[in-house]
Amino acid sequence: MVQQSPRRLELTVTADQAGEKIDTLLRRELRLSGTVIRRVKWLDDGILLDGMRVTTACRPAAGQVLSVRVADPDGQGDMVPTPGPLDIVYEDGDLLVLNKAPGVLIHPGPGHYSDTLCNYIAWYYKKAGIAADVHPVQRLDKGTSGLLVVAKHPHAQEQLKGQLHTPAFRRIYLAVCEGIPRPPEGCIDAPIGRVPGSLMARQVDPAGQPASTRYRVLRTGQGRALVELELDTGRTHQIRVHMAHIGHPLTGDFLYGTEDHSLISRCLLYTSPSPR
């Protein structure tokens, strides 16, 4: 297996750019943040000018080629590569789009250090010889299934996160809720905060973070509704909290509604693959 080289960005310095500090060129022309620059400048091959390592204070001449490494697989800390199922629907040099299965955590944490989606992705990179990082762009709860975007390096993560709350990045979900919302289409604009004394639960709280969810009823039957929901913000448990707030908790939601194992063993929430 051939190990791929870490992702790099290149810039051929023009006459107008000649004499400017490399730090300035990285920020303005390649749109790298100070955080990414500080992270890569200490790598032996982090910032190169015509193939030679340079500092960010260097001032290149016209025609020279500036190259910066944006992926740092060795900077993933104690991430344990673990074999596990992955449903990859799109991949390029900067990102993955995966279809996340329900019941799978995204990030390692207490009690789950090696059985999360990040562990499975790290294993996939290792076996495929891909020199990339694992940076999920958005959050999906353990019980939620659907599409998840994962950046392969910090620069891609920053660029994609910058699009999260813009029209360029739409997050649309399908869910089944208890009862039939009235009106059948609307916007739930209610701030969300932690429930005092709970590490997990959230609630509508006037002192919480602003949160906005748009909903549209698609179909009804047996006292329930299939609802399309689009997030304008991205708070923890936002859809679940907002739907419970208007009196229509998601079917099977043990935390904000009523858990019914005779019907379903998880909350019925799925990220939709296509916008309306």
Per-range role (PLM):
Residues 1-272, 276:
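RNA pseudouridine synthases
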